[in-house]
C-alpha cells in the first residue's frame, strides 16, 4: 500500500513531538525534517491548529486499531470484558513521549478532546466500577514512567496487570454497551 504525502508528514510531525516536544512542532521544523516547503505544508495543513487536529486524528485511529486488534473486533462487537482487557493490554506499556504530550494537550482544546473522546469512549464504561478500576490501572501504567523518578520494573507492571485481572473477571463476557443508568458508587464490591 502506498503511503500518501500527508501520512508521511504526520509521521514526521509525530517524530518531532517525540524527540523535541509539542512546542517544537512548527512549520519550520516540519519543513526541515520532511524536506517539504512551508507552502507545501500549508497546502496540507492551513494552520498549526489543523496540523494538531490531523495529528491527533491519526493517533486516535492508530489507538483504535490497536484496541480492536487486542479485543478481537470493534468495540461495538465485543464484551465489556474484552474491551477493558484490550485497554489494559494496550496501555500496560509506558506511553511514548509523543502520545503523552498529545494526550495532555488534547485536554486544552475542545475540538481535539472530542477526537479522543469519540475514539476511546466506546471502549470504557464510566458507570461500571470494575471497568473504572481497570481503566485507572491501565492509565496509571501508561503514564507512570513519565511522572515518577523511578520507572516501574517489569515485575511491578505484571503485578498491576494481575491485579487488574481480578476486576476484569468481574465484568460481563456478553457484548454490551455502557449503561448510563448504572450507579457507580453502589456497584463496587
Locate the predicted segments by residue.
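Hydrophobic alpha-helical connector segments
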Residues: 54, 61-97
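Generic hydrophobic, amphipathic alpha-helix propensity
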Residues: 5-16, 30, 55-59, 63
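A structural signal for repeat-array scaffolds
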Residues: 98-101, 146
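Hydrophobic/aromatic-rich alpha-helical bundle segments in the mid-to-C-terminal region
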Residues: 109-189
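Structural detector for internal amphipathic alpha-helices that build alpha-solenoid repeat scaffolds
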Residues: 103-105
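Helix-turn-helix
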Residues: 8, 16, 22-50
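Solvent-exposed, amphipathic alpha-helical segments
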Residues: 12-19, 66-69, 137-144
Amino acid at each position: 500500500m502506498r503511503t500518501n504525502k500527508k501520512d508521511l508528514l504526520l509521521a514526521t510531525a509525530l517524530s518531532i513531538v517525540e524527540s523535541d516536544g509539542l512546542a517544537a512542532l512548527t512549520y519550520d521544523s516540519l519543513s526541515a525534517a520532511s524536506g517539504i516547503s512551508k507552502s507545501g505544508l500549508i497546502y496540507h495543513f492551513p494552520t498549526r491548529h489543523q496540523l494538531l487536529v490531523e495529528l491527533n486524528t491519526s493517533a486516535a485511529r492508530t489507538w483504535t486499531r490497536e484496541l480492536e486488534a487486542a479485543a478481537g473486533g470493534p468495540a461495538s462487537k465485543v464484551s465489556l470484558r474484552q474491551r477493558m482487557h484490550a485497554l489494559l493490554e494496550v496501555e500496560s506499556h509506558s506511553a511514548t513521549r509523543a502520545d503523552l504530550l498529545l494526550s495532555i494537550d488534547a485536554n486544552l482544546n475542545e475540538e481535539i478532546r472530542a477526537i479522543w473522546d469519540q475514539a476511546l469512549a466506546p471502549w470504557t464504561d464510566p458507570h461500571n466500577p470494575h471497568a473504572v478500576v481497570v481503566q485507572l490501572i491501565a492509565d496509571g501504567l501508561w503514564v507512570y514512567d513519565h511522572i515518577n523518578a523511578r520507572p516501574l520494573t517489569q515485575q511491578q507492571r505484571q503485578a498491576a496487570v494481575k491485579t487488574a485481572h481480578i476486576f476484569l473477571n468481574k465484568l460481563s463476557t456478553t457484548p454490551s454497551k455502557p449503561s448510563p443508568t448504572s450507579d457507580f458508587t453502589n456497584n463496587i464490591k
